[in-house]
Amino acid sequence: MGKVKVGINGFGRIGRLVTRAAFNSGKVDIVAINDPFIDLNYMVYMFQYDSTHGKFHGTVKAENGKLVINGNPITIFQERDPSKIKWGDAGAEYVVESTGVFTTMEKAGAHLQGGAKRVIISAPSADAPMFVMGVNHEKYDNSLKIVSNASCTTNCLAPLAKVIHDNFGIVEGLMTTVHAITATQKTVDGPSGKLWRDGRGALQNIIPASTGAAKAVGKVIPELNGKLTGMAFRVPTANVSVVDLTCRLEKAAKYDDIKKVVKQASEGPLKGILGYTEHQVVSSDLNSDTHSSTFDAGAGIALNDHFVKLISWYDNEFGYSNRVVDLMAHMASKE
């Protein structure tokens, strides 16, 4: 079949960057966007200008009630209820559910009522099967109508954990992600439901936070189920995060052995997903990087041959958005 036709629900950070990734890569066609809070002219502006990734290198305009990107007209909907979006009329076969609101099978399933064939949730899901490109995407089969692309942090951790586990065996591990701020945080102190710390000013604080990313690795690599957990520190940077995986190895390994297998994976089966660098990089050097995870060979340390701390960077917005596109292209190849 030709390129799969895609609708985007929620034109926020991920919705816009999945759209950019789709146009950059040419792997899927964006044919429709739904967002009840952003009108057409505002969409043009928000897509064109981006404080983090810079101006869109292409053309974008409003014409005849449609958003036209690089000459491609995109149908715009403004429905609040996902079951009322006429995806079928717009020709959208797959829908990226990127509002962050409809993350369960039941809620995301509403898109199927409007004619979509499949839904890809751009967030972890309580009950939808999760796929991480390069790790368990081969397990996808086309009986599945609703899937999750997991979280950006799981996409960073899982490829690294897979390589380490396949080569040396992970007995147990703890992950910390030093994570850039996201839209759910507050610019200054404000109220925040159950987790009071999450409501503190994002620009002023290092904020300890929870993340299900490490436990989720056990869902995509079943042999690691119950062997990994972790937490996050939200820090005052706009984008790019870093995973610190501290783990006990079954087989003895010198740090150079670890570097070698990660480098091999980055040039072989995980090319484009897992990167490898020996450069003295800092977070901003990874801005707009398309990898899920970039192993920092110079930053990790070994206490001994069985206990290591491994460091891997990720552009939590753009790397992830590119994997959403890759997952859809993979799913389309199975139709």
Curated annotation (Swiss-Prot):
Tagged with keyword Transport: no
Chain positions found as N6,N6-dimethyllysine: 5, 66, 194, 215, 227, 260, 263, 334
Site keyed Activates thiol group during catalysis: positions: 179
Subunit: Homotetramer. Interacts with TPPP; the interaction is direct. Interacts (when S-nitrosylated) with SIAH1; leading to nuclear translocation. Interacts with RILPL1/GOSPEL, leading to prevent the interaction between GAPDH and SIAH1 and prevent nuclear translocation. Interacts with CHP1; the interaction increases the binding of CHP1 with microtubules. Associates with microtubules. Interacts with EIF1AD, USP25, PRKCI and WARS1. Interacts with phosphorylated RPL13A; inhibited by oxidatively-modified low-densitity lipoprotein (LDL(ox)). Component of the GAIT complex.
Residue sites binding D-glyceraldehyde 3-phosphate per the record: 151-153, 182, 211-212, 234
Catalytic activities: D-glyceraldehyde 3-phosphate + phosphate + NAD(+) = (2R)-3-phospho-glyceroyl phosphate + NADH + H(+); S-nitroso-L-cysteinyl-[GAPDH] + L-cysteinyl-[protein] = L-cysteinyl-[GAPDH] + S-nitroso-L-cysteinyl-[protein]
Region (Interaction with WARS1): 1-148
Organism field: Pongo abelii (Sumatran orangutan)
Chain positions found as S-nitrosocysteine: 152, 247
Signal peptide from the UniProt entry: none
Sites of ADP-ribosylcysteine modification: 152
Motif [IL]-x-C-x-x-[DE] motif boundaries: 245-250
Residues found modified as Phosphoserine: 122, 148, 151, 241, 312, 333
Chain positions with Phosphotyrosine modification: 42
PTM annotation (S-(2-succinyl)cysteine): residues: 152, 247
Post-translational modification: ISGylated. S-nitrosylation of Cys-152 leads to interaction with SIAH1, followed by translocation to the nucleus S-nitrosylation of Cys-247 is induced by interferon-gamma and LDL(ox) implicating the iNOS-S100A8/9 transnitrosylase complex and seems to prevent interaction with phosphorylated RPL13A and to interfere with GAIT complex activity.
Gene coding for it: GAPDH
Chief subcellular location: cytoplasm
Cross-link (Glycyl lysine isopeptide (Lys-Gly) (interchain with G-Cter in SUMO2)): 186
Organism placement in taxonomy: Eukaryota, Metazoa, Chordata, Craniata, Vertebrata
PANTHER family per the UniProt record, alphabetical: GLYCERALDEHYDE 3-PHOSPHATE DEHYDROGENASE (PTHR10836), GLYCERALDEHYDE-3-PHOSPHATE DEHYDROGENASE (PTHR10836:SF111)
Subcellular location(s) per record: Cytoplasm, Cytosol; Cytoplasm, Cytoskeleton; Nucleus
Name of the featured protein: Glyceraldehyde-3-phosphate dehydrogenase
Residues where Deamidated asparagine is found: 9, 64, 70, 149, 155, 225, 316
Active site: 152 (nucleophile)
